[in-house]
Every structure is written in C-alpha cells, then in structure tokens.
C-alpha cells in the first residue's frame, strides 16, 4: 500500500487488525458522519483507494459510510515470513503487481475459492473500469494480510456497516493470490451486443469451448463475464477474499456461480510433491512447473505477436467441474484402476516401469499384458500425453471438491479442473483426445468456462488496464 496512506496498517501476521489493535473504542473509531457519501458523486474515486461505488457496495449499495483517508495507488513489495498463526495459513506473501498475474505459476496453495460473475445490465464501460480498479486495490491489500480498506472491519463509523467482513482478522496472508479473467461474453454478450465497446479487442481464440464427450453441463455452473480465482493456504482467507470482492462489486456485477476447492491436484513447482485426487492416484505428474521457464514461455504465456497485444504476458484459463462417480470407482479392482489410469497407484510410476517421473513407454510389453503394451492405448496417461497431442502441454492447477451428496446418497464430489495455456487449442486438442479415455465411465463434466487472463497489473495500475488503454 502507498506509504502515504493515513491509518496504514503494519505489515506482518497481525496486520489485519492493524490500526485497531490498541486504545479505547472511542479512540479507534472516527466520529460518525451525517452522510458523507450520499451527497457526493457516486462515480468519484474514494480517497482511500476504493471508488464511491465500491464503498457503497461494501455498505450494501446505498447505506452511508466513512471513506478511508489517504492516497490511492497500490505498489506492492514481495515479502515472506509474516509470523506464526494458530490457523493452517502461513505468513507467505506474493505480490499483486508484476509482469504476470500471481496464482498461475505461483506454487499451488492448498485451498481455492473460485467465482464467476456477470456484469449487471446497465453498467457502463466507465463503471466496469472503476470496478476493476476497486478490485485491484482491494486485492493488493488482501494479499498482504490487510483488510479491503484502511478502516477495515472495526475502524470505521459505528453507525455504518464495516468495510470489511472481518473473518480474516488476525490471520496471516496465507500465500493468498487473486487472479482475474475476462470471458467471451464480456466482449460480446449472448445476444451479440457489444456493451462496453470491446468487440474489436476480443482475442480471436477466446470463444466458447466446443462440446466434448462426457459433457453434462449445467448453465448455472458454467460461463461468466468475469472470473476471480482466490487461492490460499487457509480456506478462511480465500473465502474472505471472494466474499469481500463480491461485496465491492455489488450493483455492478452479479455472482453467477462459485466453487470451493481443497487439496490441490497438481504441483506447479518442483519443490512440491505430487498430490492425489479423490480416485487415490497421484495427479499432475507431468504438469508444467514454474522452474521450467522455457516450457512456460512455450505453453503458458501469451507472447507478443500471438495477438492481441493487450493480452501479451497473460494466458487463457479453462475451468471444468468434473464430478467423479466415487461409489462406482471404489468397487473397481486395483489392477483395473491402474490399467485405466496407466500408472501404479502406490508410487505413481507408469505401468511400463520405472519411477513416478520416468517417461512412459507406450510400446514396451509386460508379463501380464500377453503381447499388448503395458500401458493401454486408451488409458488416461496415454491419451493425455504430449506425444499423442502434437506436443501440447497444460499448466494444471485444479482442486478436489465435495459438495455434499445427491438425492440418492452419493457424494457430489470430484475435480475442479483448472488449466492455463498460451492457446485454448492446447486444451481442446487434449480434451478431444480423451474422448476414448477408459476413465470417462467414471466422470461427468457438469460445469465449464473459458477466460482470457490479462497480464499482471503495474504498480499503481489495475488488472485489465491494457485492455482499456
């Protein structure tokens, strides 16, 4: 946060409580205002960094409140080690600004809250820009372990709703990252209307995904003009971020759908062990890792010249909500499970032999396959391998989910698949290749979406600024 901001909270594990840690209640709270917002232009920027509309969103779209004092702008410095916590989160911080958005090659955190939004009818281009500025300002604070504004959860007027909901007070940053994306319908809506003058700026590659084998998509779990991916090592920190960003957007966007995730199903760094999905197998062994800079340049980041220019340094995100038929899978023999996946369940080694990271051999036979390759040609490993997909690789960043149970008492559980790629065709190619996957018998795709992920915000700028400049 800008060093000139008044009432600035201190950095560290206890930063969320910040300027309300000591002193009497009277000393901590500004004097009540008669109504400083109602008589001012709602489009005018708030002095604390949030626009007046952003503050009105926090206050319930019309209630009076206290604007936080201080300078705008939100240059961020990377920092780590903010102290101990009684919660699962850590003091690790990742900067909000940078060449790329955080939350892509960042080491995958343990928890996710993902949300998709539609822009409300009647919202103008200027209001959309203002929303992105508000979201960027608030996110730049949240990733430091701060409240969404300087007055925060308990430092504002006692006669107005707090700016911040407060459930993350006292918690460290917990490696929080907040990543934003723009869907095809932001540029041209479902009726073909260019609401924000962005049609000419839409990436040619940003179109609705084709229908795939196994799709049973529900519209209420798919699409969205905008998306926000909040990842953290503490679930309360991730939920707090989405909750408060949704409040800031009140009156300008509507929450379309959201998904909670736990237990990452991929590693994005060589320092991380390969996790397991709900089928019990190691997942994402061959994932693109952050340390593979040549691979991220080739497969993840949109390069200058790929088009459009405003997206250079960004990526494309595909989300798929995949329900796993848990009860059916649990009755499958271990040997058959391994044949379906193409890997050993204990160590994750390919059935052709070796260890987890041994390159699969799709020709070698085994003593039990009677002249056939050890790895079935229709196994998941075989069909998803780059060798079978013209070299296409994805940076996967998915999570497990359990959303209760259905009317038959079966777990509504599965994989919330997230992949980042330089070109959506990479995902399409792999997904079409998986049409004969033996695993499909146990999967149902119920949600889907695609978004362009703009490059990172510059210091003092906002996410998406290159799109509107």
Please tell me what each predicted stretch does.
Residues 49, 54-469:
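Long, histidine/aromatic-enriched segments associated with O2/redox biology
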């Amino acid at each position: 946060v800008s060093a000139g901001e008044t009432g600035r909270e201190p950095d560290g594990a206890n930063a969320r409580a910040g300027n309300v840690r000591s002193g009497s209640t009277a000393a901590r709270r500004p004097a009540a205002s008669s109504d400083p917002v109602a008589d001012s232009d709602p489009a005018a920027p708030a002095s604390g960094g949030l626009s007046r509309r952003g503050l009105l969103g926090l206050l319930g779209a019309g209630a009076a409140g206290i604007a936080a004092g201080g300078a705008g702008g939100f240059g961020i410095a990377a920092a780590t080690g903010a102290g101990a916590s009684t919660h699962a989160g850590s003091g690790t911080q990742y900067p909000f600004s940078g060449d790329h958005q955080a939350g892509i090659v960042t080491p995958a955190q343990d928890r996710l809250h993902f949300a998709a939004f539609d822009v409300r009818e009647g919202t103008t281009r200027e209001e959309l820009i203002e929303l992105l500025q508000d979201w960027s300002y608030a996110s730049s604070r949240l990733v430091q372990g701060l409240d969404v504004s300087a007055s925060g959860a308990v430092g504002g007027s006692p006669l107005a709703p707090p700016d911040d909901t407060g459930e993350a007070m006292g918690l460290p940053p917990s490696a929080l990252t907040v990543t934003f994306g723009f869907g095809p319908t932001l540029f041209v809506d479902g009726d073909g209307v260019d609401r924000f003058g962005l049609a000419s700026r839409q990436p040619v590659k940003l179109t609705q995904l084709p229908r795939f084998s196994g799709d049973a998509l529900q519209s209420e779990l798919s699409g969205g003009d905008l998306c926000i991916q909040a990842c953290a090592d503490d679930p309360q920190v991730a939920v707090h971020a989405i909750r408060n960003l949704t409040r800031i957007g009140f009156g300008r966007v509507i929450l379309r759908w959201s998904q909670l995730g736990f237990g990452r199903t991929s590693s994005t760094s060589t320092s991380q062990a390969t996790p397991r999905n709900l089928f019990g197998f190691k997942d994402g062994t061959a994932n693109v890792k952050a340390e593979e800079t040549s691979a991220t340049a080739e497969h993840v980041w949109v390069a200058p010249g790929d088009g459009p220019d405003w997206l250079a340094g960004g990526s494309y995100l595909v989300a798929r909500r995949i329900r796993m038929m848990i009860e059916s899978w649990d009755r499958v023999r271990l040997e058959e499970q391994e044949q379906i996946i193409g890997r050993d369940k204990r160590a994750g080694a390919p059935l052709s032999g070796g260890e987890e990271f041994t390159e699969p051999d799709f020709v070698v036979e085994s003593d039990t396959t009677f002249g056939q390759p050890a790895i079935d040609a229709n196994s998941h490993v075989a069909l998803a391998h780059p060798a079978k997909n013209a070299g296409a690789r994805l940076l996967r960043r998915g999570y497990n989910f359990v959303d209760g149970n259905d009317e038959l008492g079966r777990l509504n559980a599965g994989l919330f698949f997230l992949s980042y790629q330089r070109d959506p065709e990479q995902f399409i190619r792999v997904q079409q290749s998986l049409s004969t996957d033996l695993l499909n018998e146990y999967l149902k795709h119920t949600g889907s979406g695609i978004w362009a992920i703009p490059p990172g915000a510059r210091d003092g700028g906002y996410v998406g600024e290159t799109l509107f400049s």
